[in-house]
Amino acid sequence: MEEYKVKFIDFLLKTGALKVFESPSEDRTLKSKRISPWFVNIGDFNDGESSNALAGFYADAVINSGVKADVLYGIPDKGVGLAAPVAMAMASKGHNVGWCFSRKDEKTHGEATNLGPEDRIKKLIVGRAPKPNDAIVQLDDVFTAGDAKYEANTFLKSLGRSNLPLLAIAVDRQEVAIDSREAIAEYQEKTGTKVVSIVNAVDVYNVLKEGNLVPEKALERLANYVRVYGTKDARTTIGTGLEQKVIGRDRSVIPACDVETLEQFEELVKQTADVEGIGGYKIGFELGLGFGLPAVVAAARKHTDKPIIYDHQKAGTDIPDTGKNYARTMKNSGVDTVIFFPQAGPETERAWIYHALDKGLNVIVGGRMTHPAYAVSEGGFITDEGALDMYRIAARAGINNFVVPGNKPDVIKQVRDVVEAEGVSPVFYAPGFIAQGGKIEAAAKVAGDRFHGIVGRGIYQAKDMHAAAVEHTSQL
């Protein structure tokens, strides 16, 4: 890594402008509404010494880009304070350029008096007003979704200033937009403006890791955030393969514990826990809401330490922010693993996955279900491609555990192809047997080496639950 990048990150840390939080209570909400465990505030450079140093880093970024600059434009709000200092720093390095930023309100007095329409820009700009053909280099602090950058681009072009070759920022957070497109790549494509940054998220991560500059937990939280929200390059560099191992074996049967009472649940666990092929226990809202998750987990722990998987029918269908509280509740209850069906969209999916990982929970993601008329192709509401996107986004975040409909082998094949295309080696969990017509052996054949059949009534309604568990596990 270039020496100036290391120096800049060290500078950010020493000034307190870069913060990586160990505790979720310190997290910051970004303009994009994402809740982030790391934050850069260029506004913390608010004295002469730090502003001068910051300007030098920006000047190097602009000069090293090789792009010709006539005028620097500070994008409101954080970029306004950058324009003049960066111009001064560039002058000290042999590059004399103008600087400017926009007014909140059009000026009507002083030098703005009696200006013609062609000079209207002088009423709206503080500093040197760019000429029509001037190369305008825009300055801002960070790039997340890019809202302020698009607004600045539109503003300058409305004044007839369309020569906008470069945007220089301090930190590229390397995040994808809501539609999963890479935010900076999309901005460059739409505007024709090249973006350069002093450092990016991966640079920050690598320097912090190599120098042991933040607590291990804080670094882990930063890594998980980038895995979920990061661009492909960022995810690949940090490492997307979480390889969460929910079940201690490659194939098993998981009883779906949809029983009415806590006593019935405990008896189910007691009779099946010693069956070698039983991998864990899936509980749902009836037990969870009826008796409280801590009590349900405690009942299971009397007989087994096999994982407890909570399927809230269907978690991940609420707004993104609620994922944080959900994950905290699950962790406090003693649940090991959560199942999400993120039908509320990509931002909800990313948020719920991130917060679950942040709490140390295992995550299983579903998109297709066992019953008729779920997907559009079956007469339902959810588009087939939309359901596949639920799996795709999860795979890009490093998730490797997925729920698939065991009675629809063709769908299992589709999902497998999608997640393997993202570089993930999947582990599948499939309901849909017995009452819904699926065959464990047929689903397992399509799913591959790592497969767990979810069986409900076929076990808990059997006269001999132990014998039923043995029978179902023999089909693996």
Task: List the model feature ranges, each with a label.
Residues N153, K157, V246-I247, A273, ...:
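Surface-exposed amphipathic alpha-helices with a cationic face
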Residues I136-Q138, D250, T317-P409, G423-S425:
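Conserved anion-binding
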Residues D274, I278, K282-N332, H371-A375, ...:
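N-terminal active-site wall of soluble small-molecule enzyme domains
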Residues E441-R450, R457-L476:
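C-terminal helical cap(s) of enzyme catalytic domains, especially alpha/beta-barrels
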Residues G43-N46, R251-Q264, D311-P320, T370-E385, ...:
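Active-site mouth loops of central-metabolism enzymes
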Residues R251-C257, G279-I283, I308-H312, V338-F340, ...:
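Hydrophobic faces of well-ordered beta-strands that scaffold small-molecule active sites
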Residues L262-F265, L287-K302, T317-N325, P342-L361, ...:
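Active-site-adjacent beta->alpha loops and helix N-cap segments on the catalytic face
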Residues M1-L139, T144-K245, E267-A273, E286-F291, ...:
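PRPP-associated nucleotide enzymes
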